[in-house]
Amino acid sequence: MKRRALFATLTLGALSLFATLAPTAFAQTPIKFALDWRFEGPAAPYFVALDKGYYKAEGLDVTIDTGNGSTEAINRAASGAYQFVFGDINTLVRFRDKPESKKLKVVAMIYDAPPFAIVSLKKAGISKPKDLEGKTLGAPAADGAYAQWPAFVKKNGIDASKVKIENVGFPVREPMLVEGKVDAITGFSFSSYMNLRGRGIAQDDIHVMLMRNLGLELYGNGIIVDSEYAAKNPKIVQGFVRATLKGWQDAIADPKGAIASLMKRNSILNDGQEFVRFKMAIDQNVLTPEVRANGIGGVDMKRLARSIEQIGEGFKFSNKPKAEDIFDASYLPAKPERTITQ
């Protein structure tokens, strides 16, 4: 009886101690993460990381919100409202040019090749960059692809004076192309392509020119964080990056499963269309030869430096950042953990 009483006392004591320590020892740090766009195919990997408990395993209680472009995402990080955002590194380069700007950095590159593209219908007869001369190009002023237009023009020998630029809104960009009000548009390749397919345009009638394949060495979207926050919270940043890259690795291995995670958050989507959109992002923007060789998440700092020079062809720097001002690899997992085997 004494043994039983002693065991009961010890058990109750242990449970009491566990109850006292649990909130501290197992507390999850709240994290807000903003995307650059809606919950569509390319957002699926983050929900994979969420559903598989990768963020939770790092002690992070992550909330994922939609966005409205990289400029908004970067401003959200700069304001401190979000600890992490997914945004375009080229937009960040321009943002960092301001001396008073928050010292935001990319800590994991996701789109090794940016989705910036010139999209047209085949009836317009635009098969190469020079064919844009004499045409009307529909481009939203805030579009990330349009921001690269000066460098694209220079690299491809286009006479910009012969191209009429029509400032169009994001919602009417593809409709105006379908209606023939513009001859071509700037945009993200997978978004514009899927929007046109959704409007009944046949696959063979859509022509996409990826700027990455036509002379631009730019990178695309990555995970952005305030460097001051990162310095104060290195384990949080390391954990978030590690969990996010695991989500991407799993999503690449099982894209249909990834889309199933996405559909839980946006059930009005067409899962077949989002699968195609996601596969386009994987094949065109994520799984480049560089990523297959070196793993996901990193960058070539020399290429990044060259990309900053290319941005300068259409943007007048007053305080041009260096590559090391823009990307910090110190929070990445070791290369074997970032390898893509597909």
Residue ranges and their predicted role:
Residues 160-164, 203-207, 268-280, 317-325:
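Short, surface-exposed acidic
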Residues 21-27:
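Sec/Tat signal peptide C-region and signal peptidase I cleavage site
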Residues 232-316:
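Secondary-structure end/capping motifs
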Residues 63, 71, 167, 209-211, ...:
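Short linear loop/turn motifs
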Residues 1-13:
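Bacterial N-terminal signal peptides that target proteins for export
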Residues 302-342:
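Conserved C-terminal helix/tail region of periplasmic/extracytoplasmic solute-binding proteins
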Residues 89-90, 99, 171-176, 181-271:
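Pocket-lining segment of extracytoplasmic ligand-binding domains
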